[in-house]
Amino acid sequence: MNKYSIYVDHTLLKPDASLDEIHNLCEEAEENEFYSVCINPCFIKVAKHYLLETPVKICTVVGFPLGANTTETKVFETRNAIALGADEIDMVININQLKSANREYCLQEINEVKKACSDKVLKVIVETALLDQEQKEFAARIILESDADFIKTSTGFAKEGAKLEDIILWKQILGDAKQIKAAGGIKNLDDFKAFIDAGATRIGTSSAIKILNNQ
């Protein structure tokens, strides 16, 4: 096993992903001992079958990719995903409410979804490409105050993905109280290592095989 494998959420979230591609994703995750596969909810059940009796976790997305669903919808999505077999939930926060610094709304949404997660892991996607510096700091402080397990940079569908300076900023605010997932645009081993060194404990990427083979 590559020493970096355990950091990887092996990701396939494109809207036209096929069953064959999901099968291949799961095989790669098992062979390379990645931490999880990150897939759309419609594939949870089949991925659970492919990964039966392996340690690979199943991560899925909620409120994805815009975050504009109601909290009630996100709670339903979360419960449904876990019933299907998801181990981790990557939920897109309501971006408008976050940018408006609506602390009460953001906290309530995160905590309601975490309650629906029960003992499963909740990562909150804040879409850094749409935030200014003050909003990024606010996002980290909301996560620190909330019941979430992780803050996550990006959906991979915005104009930019993870930036090293954001991981450094969040690590300063969060310390070891919450974990950080860097995702979006991570394509080479040097960047992968830099994000880990800066404090990320999980990397979401669709390029994990190439990255860890240093291609």
UniProtKB/Swiss-Prot annotation:
Q: In which pathway does it act?
A: Carbohydrate degradation; 2-deoxy-D-ribose 1-phosphate degradation; D-glyceraldehyde 3-phosphate and acetaldehyde from 2-deoxy-alpha-D-ribose 1-phosphate: step 2/2
**Which Gene Ontology terms describe the biological processes this protein takes part in?**
2-deoxyribose 1-phosphate catabolic process; carbohydrate catabolic process; deoxyribonucleotide catabolic process
- Domain of life, per UniProt, equals Bacteria
* Entry keyword set: Cytoplasm, Lyase, Schiff base
Q: Which GO terms describe its molecular function?
A: deoxyribose-phosphate aldolase activity
Report any Pfam family annotated for this entry.
DeoC
Cited SMART domains: DeoC
Give the EC class as a word: lyase
Where is the protein situated, by its record's location annotation?
Cytoplasm
Q: Where is the active site?
A: D90, K152, K181
Q: Which residues cross the membrane?
A: none
Q: Give the record's family classification.
A: Belongs to the DeoC/FbaB aldolase family. DeoC type 1 subfamily.
Give the HAMAP family listed for this entry.
Answer: DeoC_type1
Reported function: Catalyzes a reversible aldol reaction between acetaldehyde and D-glyceraldehyde 3-phosphate to generate 2-deoxy-D-ribose 5-phosphate.
- This protein is called Deoxyribose-phosphate aldolase
Per the UniProt entry, what species is this protein from, by scientific name?
Answer: Ureaplasma urealyticum serovar 10 (strain ATCC 33699 / Western)
Q: Which gene encodes it?
A: deoC
